[in-house]
């Protein structure tokens, strides 16, 4: 009966996916992004034309703001927006003002909400990473070797309280927080080049100058990463100096610590702080609710010159899980659901489709852009020396991959969508766009993709993981008991759980003992940082639009991915910790770190990455990053995927205008990696309620 039900569900979902325009099972790597290296003009992210001239008598602002102007409590629009505002072209039509966007969100720290607000980023990814356009900055220029950049701000831009926004707000972050040894903010890696921190100055109120010791060709790409404005979802970059001075010991002698400062600087929990967002926070109930209202000084307009956003308010209620969020969508309570709906399993698609007739709910499927789907990665710097040796055996890792039934994953969990894969970076990455890249992508994708238990068994035998005591369970080469423990963040979703169970089933079928270990989120972070996990699971690789903007998956540059101790070793290179604590054991160092032995792939990956990140020539840099892929092909897999670039669900009521379809997006969507700032990258401020 269960088998019959599964195939019935597959049939229903297949029809729903077709109705939503699901991507083909095999999608070719994206075309090469347009070059974005020329100095940028002060142009809009989507619009090529300036706003239309205001018609006589038109207000071009929300009625609630116009009433305040008439009452004399708010300056007129021309005094509230910059002379050269950001112009956002609506996807379909000029919208209408009014309404409240009700959100029911599982991210109680405001992470998902931050992803809907892209307005702190000076540079914006557009067209799913195919191009970059100005955002908070109106433009930029740079010298030939990309060692010096100027970032130009929009004159007349204001914080949400009406105070001027200038280069001093960046310099406050940089000088009084980042370069302040008493504060926890540190220089982000993209402001370090040639082993030296950039020299940053502000020659005037609207110019910021960056000078690097070596070429820094990724600088603009990195400014476009994340929504910014809060950590850890990017960098703060701009902090309202006029407001935050009161909490800073340098400016207020009554303050001696940064405790109150750090509490007050985050807009997600402090509704008093001025912001540069489309909506400004007005009330906050910790872990329960956050209410925001339109920012009267927001610096963006539509192509008719109407100040954005169209929607008056954002009312966020925090809920426990995606199931609770789903119920609010089906009740018609949530007008638009991006995150967390993208985390809904595809089995829910038919449920959402059924709500079309009852509440006028629309659904679409945006590509995740993921290179692995749900995946696992063995700990390359495992604390157990026996497991460390086994996990570094390529035969063993390939055997784990051959023992995964990807056909089953694709059919049952992803309903025939996506692309089976051994695990790569995003198929939408620029590295896979030319003929060399397409060939590399295919080799990497197909490295150990077949479901072949005979091959898996033979490779496990070759790796020495044999049944030493005749109990039917494979042991370590020493004869000691072997248990593979897949460590998962306890706050996971049904898709992660379902795929991980199929992985467990496959591994057990070749004689491996497997446990799935759900761990508290905070503890999972500690285990990752200290290299205490066994095999990390319930996660996915999807970063883009190129390897170098977030290299952690393919190059071990931090402690938060495959080789924590080696990543931490690399991370302190060039800092005052380099070369210190060598008399201590790796786990006793702060942070815990270890130098790789000669011949370890870490050295080759670091060599290629260090060369690529300072290579100003685009073609040469592309060739270097493709060599990084070649290391993964020749010595991997280091992470093991299942089904890549699967579709994700978004929903919205038919009363909502200007929500793009996947066909209107540059690459059909790119919802997986947070560095792409979905859904801020499709500008919710131009979405509206039809009246």
Predicted stretch roles:
Residues 9-14:
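Hydrophobic helical h-region of N-terminal Sec-dependent signal peptides
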Residues 61, 67-71, 75-144, 175:
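N-terminal lobe/hinge region of extracytoplasmic solute-binding protein
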Residues 215-221, 300, 534-535, 649:
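Short, charged/polar, Gly/Pro-enriched secondary-structure boundary elements
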Residues 118-122, 162, 252-270:
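Edge beta-strand plus adjacent loop/short-helix module at the start
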Residues 213, 417, 643-647:
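Short, well-ordered beta-to-alpha junction loops that form the rim of enzyme active sites
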Residues 4-5, 16, 20-55, 67, ...:
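Extracytoplasmic/periplasmic ligand-capture domains
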């Amino acid at each position: 009966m269960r088998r019959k039900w599964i195939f019935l569900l597959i049939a229903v979902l297949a029809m729903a996916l077709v109705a939503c325009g699901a991507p083909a099972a095999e999608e070719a790597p994206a075309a090469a992004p347009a070059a974005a290296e020329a100095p940028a003009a002060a142009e809009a992210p989507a619009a090529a034309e300036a706003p239309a001239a205001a018609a006589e008598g038109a207000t071009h602002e929300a009625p609630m703001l116009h009433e305040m102007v008439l009452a004399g409590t708010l300056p007129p629009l021309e005094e509230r927006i910059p002379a050269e505002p950001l112009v956002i072209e609506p996807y379909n039509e000029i919208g209408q003002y009014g309404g409240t966007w009700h959100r029911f969100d599982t991210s109680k720290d405001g992470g998902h909400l931050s992803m809907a607000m892209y307005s702190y980023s000076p540079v914006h990814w557009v067209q799913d990473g195919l191009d970059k356009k100005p955002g908070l900055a109106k433009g930029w220029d740079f010298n030939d070797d990309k060692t010096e950049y100027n970032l130009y701000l929009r004159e007349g831009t204001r914080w949400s309280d009406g105070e001027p926004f200038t280069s001093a707000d960046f310099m406050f972050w940089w000088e009084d927080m980042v370069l302040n040894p008493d504060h926890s903010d540190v220089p982000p890696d993209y402001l370090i080049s040639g082993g030296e921190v950039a020299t940053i100055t502000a020659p005037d109120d609207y110019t910021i100058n960056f000078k690097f010791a070596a070429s820094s060709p990724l600088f603009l790409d990195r400014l476009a990463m994340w929504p910014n404005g809060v950590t850890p979802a990017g960098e703060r970059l701009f902090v309202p100096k006029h407001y935050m001075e009161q909490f800073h010991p340098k400016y207020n002698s009554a303050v001696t610590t940064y405790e109150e400062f750090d509490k007050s600087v985050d807009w997600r929990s402090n509704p008093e702080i001025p912001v540069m967002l489309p909506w400004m926070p007005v009330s906050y109930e910790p872990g329960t609710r956050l209410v925001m209202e339109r920012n009267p000084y927001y610096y963006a307009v539509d192509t008719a010159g109407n100040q954005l956003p169209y929607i008056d308010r954002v009312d966020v209620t925090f809920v426990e899980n995606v199931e609770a969020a789903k119920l609010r969508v089906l009740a018609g309570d949530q007008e638009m659901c991006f995150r967390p709906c993208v985390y809904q399993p595809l089995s829910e698609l038919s449920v959402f489709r059924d709500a079309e007739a009852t509440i006028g709910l629309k659904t679409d499927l945006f590509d995740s852009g993921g290179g692995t789907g749900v995946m696992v990665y063995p700990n390359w710097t495992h604390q157990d020396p026996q497991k460390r040796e086994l996990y570094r055996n390529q035969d063993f890792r390939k055997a784990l991959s051959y023992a995964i039934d990807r056909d089953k994953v694709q059919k049952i969990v992803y309903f025939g969508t996506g692309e089976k894969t051994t695990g790569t970076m995003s198929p939408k990455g620029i590295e896979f766009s030319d003929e060399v890249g397409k060939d590399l992508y295919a080799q990497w994708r197909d490295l150990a993709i077949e479901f072949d238990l005979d091959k898996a068994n033979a490779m496990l035998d070759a790796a020495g993981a044999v049944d030493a005591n005749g109990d039917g369970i494979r042991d370590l080469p020493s004869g000691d008991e072997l248990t593979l423990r897949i460590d998962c963040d306890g706050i996971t979703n049904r898709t992660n759980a379902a795929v991980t169970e199929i992985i467990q089933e496959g591994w057990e079928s070749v004689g491996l003992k497997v446990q799935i270990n759900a761990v508290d989120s905070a503890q999972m972070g500690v285990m990752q940082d200290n290299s205490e996990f066994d095999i990390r699971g319930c996660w996915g690789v999807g970063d883009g639009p190129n390897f170098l903007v977030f290299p952690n998956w393919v190059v071990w540059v931090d402690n938060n991915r495959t080789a924590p101790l080696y990543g931490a070793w690399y991370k302190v290179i060039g800092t005052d910790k380099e070369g210190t604590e060598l008399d201590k054991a790796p786990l006793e160092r702060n942070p815990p770190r270890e130098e790789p032995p000669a011949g370890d792939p870490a050295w080759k990956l670091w060599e290629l990455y260090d060369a690529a990140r300072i290579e100003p020539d685009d073609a040469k840099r592309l060739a270097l990053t493709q060599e990084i892929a070649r290391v993964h092909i020749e010595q991997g897999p280091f992470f093991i995927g299942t089904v890549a670039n699967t579709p994700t669900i978004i929903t919205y009521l038919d009363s909502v205008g200007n929500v793009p379809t996947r066909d209107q997006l540059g690459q059909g969507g790119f919802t997986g990696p947070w560095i792409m700032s979905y859904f801020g990258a499709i500008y919710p401020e131009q979405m509206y309620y039809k009246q």
